[in-house]
Every structure is written in C-alpha cells, then in structure tokens.
C-alpha cells in the first residue's frame, strides 16, 4: 500500500524539476555569463553538480590532420579530488611521493593494471618506463589513462606534472563525431571562477584548430549541469 507522504514527496520533487526546467528557454541563445546564471537557477539536485560543456566542431577526426586533442589548466580547478599514479624507477619514487602522488611504483603498478585494479584518475610516467607500460596500453588507452608526452604525462618533471594534475588539469579530445565534452568545475563555484574556467577551455580548443581545416570550425556549443538543464551558447558572443 502506497504511503501518502511518499506520494506527496514524489509529486513535490516532480514539481521542482518542472519549475527548474521552465526557467530555461530552449529556443534562446545565451552568452556565457547568462548561461551560468540560468543553469544555477535551474539546478534542483541535492548534490553539487558539475558544469559541463559540449562543443561541436566542424572536423573529421578520422583524418589524422584533423585530430583535436590537448590539456587545459583550469584557473579555478575542477573541484574534484584527483588521484595520481606515477610509474617510475625506484630512484625517483621518493620524489614522486613528496610531490603528492597517491600511488607510486613501477612494474608492481603495471601488474595491478593487468589484473584490472585501477584506482587512479591520472597516470604519469617517466620516459624510461614507457616500454614496460606498452604492455597495458590496450587497457589504459580506452580509459583515457595512457601516459602521453603531448599531454605532459610522460615527463622527467614529475613534480610539475603532479602539480598540474592535482590543481585542475583537464584533458580534451574530439570524438569521432567531432564533439568535445568536458567538466569544468562545480556549480557551487562563483560565477567568476566558472567563467574563468570556461574562457580558458574555449580559448584552448579554438587555438587547437587544425591549420588545414576548411569551413567553419566551431559549429555549436552547449552548457549543462549534471542531471540539469542544457542551454545553447550564442557563438557570436565568443570573443
């Protein structure tokens, strides 16, 4: 038998969702400032949602010269606790630990990865370990965890790499459909901090435009929050 109180709570929750979504006009184009304000006012979840961006690019990633990929250091961070693994030779393990790495080792970490144990968000490696790491490339690659010199995760500068990963470094990569998706901070951040992150990310993606690309590069852009509304950005408002 249904509890009347439970039914009332469900109806109340549904009403809140409807009211929140009604605050966002689906046919309206927003600039970044107004978009952030609208998403905050339309959020109804009880946890701290992530501000997410989706960018549709006029590229074909199947062509090697149209790959768009890189990393961005977000000025205000991501709001997430990032677990960092460092794979290096024994003589550099203490340096990695002192720099704040959560997991440090060499072949022992590689063996854990082979067994399916992956308890880190970022994997950093020194160049002399890459041959050994190649044995788990098929595991780490699809998860976006394979160390890559272009992303700063294959490096001799362990300390700085850990600092970047911990402070809010976000990787982006265009999917087969030409779409880039990333989380750029928590909705509880100040509007100013969210806008700093947004501008830094958008600027980086625009700078990554393939030199030989013909036609329009940035096709569409949307902002949303976790389990929340989505708004379309007016591309003419992007400097």
Curated annotation (Swiss-Prot):
InterPro entries: Ribosom_uL1_bac-type, Ribosomal_uL1, Ribosomal_uL1-like, Ribosomal_uL1/biogenesis, Ribosomal_uL1_3-a/b-sand, Ribosomal_uL1_CS. GO terms for cellular component: large ribosomal subunit. Disulfide bonds: none annotated. CDD domains: Ribosomal_L1. GO terms for molecular function: rRNA binding; structural constituent of ribosome; tRNA binding. Keywords: Repressor, Ribonucleoprotein, Ribosomal protein, RNA-binding, rRNA-binding, Translation regulation, tRNA-binding. One of its GO terms (biological process) is regulation of translation. It comes from the Bacteria. The keyword Ribosomal protein applies. Belongs to the universal ribosomal protein uL1 family. Binds directly to 23S rRNA. The L1 stalk is quite mobile in the ribosome, and is involved in E site tRNA release. Protein L1 is also a translational repressor protein, it controls the translation of the L11 operon by binding to its mRNA. This is Large ribosomal subunit protein uL1. The gene is rplA.
């Amino acid at each position: 038998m249904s509890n009347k109180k439970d039914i009332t709570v469900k109806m109340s929750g549904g009403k809140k969702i409807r009211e929140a979504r009604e605050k966002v006009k689906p046919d309206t184009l927003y600039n970044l400032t107004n978009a952030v304000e609208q998403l905050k006012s339309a959020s109804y979840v009880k946890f701290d949602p992530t501000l997410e961006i989706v960018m549709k690019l006029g590229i074909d990633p199947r062509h090697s010269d149209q790959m768009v990929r890189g990393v961005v250091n977000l000025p205000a961070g991501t709001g997430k606790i990032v677990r960092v693994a460092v794979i290096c030779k024994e003589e550099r393990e203490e340096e990695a630990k002192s720099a704040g790495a959560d997991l440090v080792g060499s072949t022992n970490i590689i063996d854990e990865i082979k067994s399916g144990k992956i308890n880190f968000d970022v994997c950093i490696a020194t160049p002399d370990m890459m041959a050994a790491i190649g044995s788990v490339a098929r595991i780490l690659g699809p998860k976006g965890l394979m160390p890559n010199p272009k992303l700063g995760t294959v490096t001799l500068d362990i300390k700085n790499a850990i600092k970047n990963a911990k402070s809010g470094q976000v990787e982006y990569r265009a999917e087969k459909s030409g779409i880039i998706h990333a989380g750029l901070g928590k909705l509880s951040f100040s509007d100013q901090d969210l806008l700093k992150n947004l501008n830094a990310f958008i600027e980086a993606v625009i700078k990554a435009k393939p030199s030989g690309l013909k036609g329009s590069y940035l096709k569409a852009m949307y902002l949303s929050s976790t389990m929340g509304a989505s708004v379309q950005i007016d591309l003419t408002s992007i400097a």
